[in-house]
């Protein structure tokens, strides 16, 4: 009789265990989050930096931490690289672009870079490239090289990066994007139509000579892991171009990378 009770008890325990395990599996399945679409993943990847816009005082970046991985050496606080340029087709059938890149080292709390003027010709002539060294102190761009052209000097000293006045916190509201993926690199691209009523578009029209009423296209490009990578690269472009043979766009990027480099890597 005692043996029979033990057998019955064993069967009851087994049935209850199977029931509990089945419930847990069902719960795990129901609670498993649905993977975001690639469009949403691209937006979220950009949002990690774009949510900081506008960065009115660039020196705030000295206290901003970015994505860190194994590429960073011990003790390296990293470096922010901010970049903006305005590109347009020129009369020679080529491309002219002008802008600035600034490297903000969080270790030394110093910012150095250069303003560039580039002219690319359609054919038969090498491109012209001129760089003018700059540094930033007290959130002010200081020109280090001598510049004879008064208008160019003013453009350099009064330059503002797109990230200083842009507001892309509502990026998630852009929808129906055209997404393309190259898994081999990997790289990701997304395009969204913008409106001329967008405050970011209005800001660009007030700062640059944009001789078209065409509403622009917002283009996002990522090289590397969508979750983040110090060796990856993100670029944002607002394209006002009228057609394939016409270039008119503003390119912006803000990336966080290691500041300290081994001598063997240089």
Curated annotation (Swiss-Prot):
Q: Where in the cell is it found?
A: Cell membrane
Q: Chief subcellular site? A: membrane
The UniProt record lists lipidation (S-diacylglycerol cysteine) at: 23
Residue span of the signal peptide, if any?
1-22
Q: Which GO terms describe its cellular component?
A: plasma membrane
InterPro entries of this UniProt entry? Answer: Csa (IPR007595), Csa_sf (IPR038641)
Source domain of life: Bacteria
Q: Sorted alphabetically, which Gene3D superfamilies does this protein's record hold?
A: 2.50.20.40
Cysteine disulfide partners in this protein: none
Query: At which residues is a lipid of type N-palmitoyl cysteine covalently attached?
Result: 23
Going by the UniProt record, its keywords in alphabetical order are: Cell membrane, Lipoprotein, Membrane, Palmitate, Signal
What topology in the membrane does the UniProt record assign?
Lipid-anchor
Name the family: Belongs to the staphylococcal tandem lipoprotein family.
Instruction: Quote the protein name from its UniProt record.
Output: Uncharacterized lipoprotein SA0403
* Organism the protein comes from: Staphylococcus aureus (strain N315)
Upper lineage is:
Bacteria, Bacillati, Bacillota, Bacilli, Bacillales
